[in-house]
């Protein structure tokens, strides 16, 4: 997407990544994490944050040398060339943005309608989903600087609300609630949950997907990635300590989808419940804003470089590309037609596979981009283990989703094979910006 010439600053890039990472997950699956990890939830967030930092090591080394809005696909293409695997991964990357938009739209409707005491029915949900996607799509008409400024404000409000939650919660904490449980079953639950919550750190990739629009990307892309992960890790751990330190685990599990809002009541009362609900709306909004921006950039870059159909790169209204409108429209369609829980799990597995190929690409290109081989090998082993844990979890909890993952990979491969045969298009060698 050819946006205006103004570049994103370091902190605007950080705010975009934080906006995606502290998205719906901290609010919607917090109760699930409490059920699996118990009072080891803060340690779970630390462990999953370490996984993210390992992946980020490869992202920063590659992102400093390979500047492209195609993000991880540019890294993989540089390492293994133009082939069916690269093409399939590029389609999976773009689809992950589409489905994420749908998830955020559904999550926003779920919080917004009760907050304004509106009837929760199919019509109101649909109108809300369409409206919120349309709003942030319109915001993206005005280019990366408008997106960055809006994201900075949204993330600031969200962090202030979560900061109040953390500060107030720490004052009234029950120390016995947060003592780590070292029983073997509890430790295994913590490791298992870390594979789930690793997904809560996935948003840092939006930085590399917008690297062409970031000031001094060689310096700021690595900085933005590490800063954003560390900020998010601090917030996650603080929220977890405040939540489990004020509410017994059993009550957190019962609260399920609004666990944080319920956890705020003991020390902030009804005002806390309201603030956390508003924080959830800001959180989901910022995640959607950054995801629409990142998804449109990926669609444009991949079309320009030969992997998606040419109409994705055509400019239409307001000098934006059709890729922006198609990405948003498909996101709305998924939100209106499908239950997104299973699809979200499939998307998470897709990101894991992309991360594995990014680390592999770093190993192949290590002489060119720099880095230590032992760290790269260790990262690959760890992320592969996390991926297998995720698959195992889905196998024992939702067999349909497990088969859906396999079907997704096979389906995309078949599409890629047919697409290349019919169109004869290949990746362009001009997808990279020399840094």
UniProtKB/Swiss-Prot annotation:
It is a multi-pass membrane protein. The chain crosses the membrane at residues 14-34, 44-64, 84-104, 123-143, 153-173, 187-207, 224-244, 267-287, 324-344, 346-366, 375-395, 400-420. It comes from Methanocaldococcus jannaschii (strain ATCC 43067 / DSM 2661 / JAL-1 / JCM 10045 / NBRC 100440) (Methanococcus jannaschii). GO terms for molecular function: transmembrane transporter activity. The keyword Translocase does not apply. It is found in: Cell membrane. The keyword Ribosomal protein does not apply. GO terms for cellular component: plasma membrane. This is Uncharacterized protein MJ0609. Keywords: Cell membrane, Membrane, Transmembrane, Transmembrane helix.
